[in-house]
Amino acid sequence: MKSLIRPLVVIFVVLTAVTGLAYPAVLTAFGQAVFPWQANGSLIERNGQVVGSALIGQSFDAPKYFWGRLSATSPMPYNATGSGGSNLGPLNPSLAEQVKARIAALRDAGTDLSKPVPVDLVTASASGLDPEITPAAAAYQIERVANARHLARETVAQLVAANTTGRQFGVLGEPRVNVLKLNLALDAAQAAH
């Protein structure tokens, strides 16, 4: 019996050291050396203060800001601990109510509703934490944001274009706009104006 226990203990200790200590230490060192910004949460700073992460959406509801996708985390929007699949099915009456409420909020904020509303402005993402919207959703909001900030529409459109990221490697994903980065660029442009 003793001859069976010793190898089990040795294997347990070795595997614990390799998978619990060595492997995480090597990956952490690699991440810090090769991708330090990403390994530390892709934090965005302004005037030396962290204002958010490029990977987690934030709640913007003032008309002078671009709005991101709906957060599906409740009761606190963009709560990373509450992330998860949350979109309602297409036949669920609650989805229609949420979409109508979001369209009403867009209308109340002064958005021109004569054009079709991009779907990512009225539905939540699967995680409920998306930091990005489509260029169409950003373009849809340009007039409202420009009016609220008393900036030229062309100035706001240029900021949207400057903050639009294309497909990764030219083929993966879709073009997108990081809402936090765009809103920070808007604040900086208005301060300089």
Swiss-Prot record:
User: What is the protein's major site of localization?
Assistant: membrane
Organism annotation: Burkholderia multivorans (strain ATCC 17616 / 249)
Name this protein carries in UniProt: Potassium-transporting ATPase KdpC subunit
Q: What are the record's GO terms for cellular component?
A: plasma membrane
Q: Which UniProt keywords apply?
A: ATP-binding, Cell inner membrane, Cell membrane, Ion transport, Membrane, Nucleotide-binding, Potassium, Potassium transport, Transmembrane, Transmembrane helix, Transport
UniProt-annotated location(s): Cell inner membrane
Which domain of life does the UniProt lineage start with? Bacteria
Gene encoding it?
Answer: kdpC
Q: What role does it play?
A: Part of the high-affinity ATP-driven potassium transport (or Kdp) system, which catalyzes the hydrolysis of ATP coupled with the electrogenic transport of potassium into the cytoplasm. This subunit acts as a catalytic chaperone that increases the ATP-binding affinity of the ATP-hydrolyzing subunit KdpB by the formation of a transient KdpB/KdpC/ATP ternary complex.
Q: Tell me, how does this one assemble?
A: The system is composed of three essential subunits: KdpA, KdpB and KdpC.
Q: Is this entry keyworded Cytoplasm?
A: no
Q: Name one GO molecular function term.
A: P-type potassium transmembrane transporter activity
The UniProt transmembrane annotation reads: 7-27
Listed InterPro entries: KdpC (IPR003820)
Write down the membrane topology.
Single-pass membrane protein
Similarity field? Belongs to the KdpC family.
